[in-house]
Amino acid sequence: MKKLLAILLSVFIMVPSCGGEGVSKEDPDNPYIWGGGSNKDEPGSEGKTYYPKPDGAFRIMTYNVGAFHKYISVMNQNIDLVSKIIKEIEADVVGINELDSMNTRHNANQVALLAKELGGWQWHFGKAIDYQGGAYGNGVVVPKGVRIVDKYTVALPNPTSYESRSIAVVETDKYVLAASHLDHSTEDYIQIQIQAVNAWAQTRYAGCDKPVFYLGDMNSVPTSEAIKSLLTCWDVISSKENTVGTMPATRCIDYIFHYKKSAPVKVLGSHTISRTYCGDVSKASDHLPVYVDVVF
């Protein structure tokens, strides 16, 4: 126990700051309502979207992009498709998992290329591991014009021989968004990571006057001990529709959370994105993106 506490404390020597599963039936009393399609003249393919965005909503997206090489062999074509999906969905901020940065697999900063394709968005890359002469990790993209007050990376503790993990954090003047990709190897290692995630939030953002969101590929289903441990500090605000597996998707492992001790939000709706007008979302990655609409 003393060794674990020492590991957790070492993660947080940082500058202080801030301080319904498978839902498809329309139901006005259910916040995870299905978007039945729209022809409004907004961003997207010819202004169309299957997921209409409510007026005044802030739309958060999480997306494991699989290093932009799962099914489309040309990286730039894959990035182009993902950027079109983000535009069609009208996301206001996106957390991204499985990004390459200047390695021999992809000699490019992938999150920077995506941000450019989105029209000059701002970005942050958080390295998880050294990989093939470069790096591999998570990222966050936010529109140009958003005021970023801090961006940083939290290295999660790793007392094992398994892959190291991290959190990529962007703090703006209105909200905090943190993207992470947790391990799946052993329950003990997963719990060590989750204790560190919870301790990071408690240490840095307890009582924060703006909402704090944590999102990404948790590699755990909703009924797992891992998600139960996260729920001691966080609320799941995204749909629990399936996000990964041979299409149609068979498991939910990608989530968006809200930190209980930060400023409150109201959830308007959420979905896993299983179809888009701009292209075949099942070919963009082996994961489906997830969004949630909130107001705060």
Residues covered by each model-derived region:
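Active-site-proximal beta-strand elements of phosphoester/diester hydrolases
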Residues: 57-70, 150-152, 169-183
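N-terminal, active-site-proximal structural segment of metallo-dependent hydrolase catalytic domains
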Residues: 15-117, 130-134, 195, 286, ...
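Hydrophobic core
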Residues: 9, 13-14
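Structured beta-strand-rich core segments of catalytic domains in phosphoester-bond hydrolases
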Residues: 32-37, 42-52, 99-175, 269-273
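Metal-dependent phosphoester-hydrolase catalytic domains
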Residues: 30-49, 188, 202-213, 219-296
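Sec-dependent signal peptide recognition
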Residues: 2-7
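Active-site beta-strand/loop signature of hydrolases that rely on acidic residues for catalysis
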Residues: 59-65, 82-107, 141, 177-180, ...
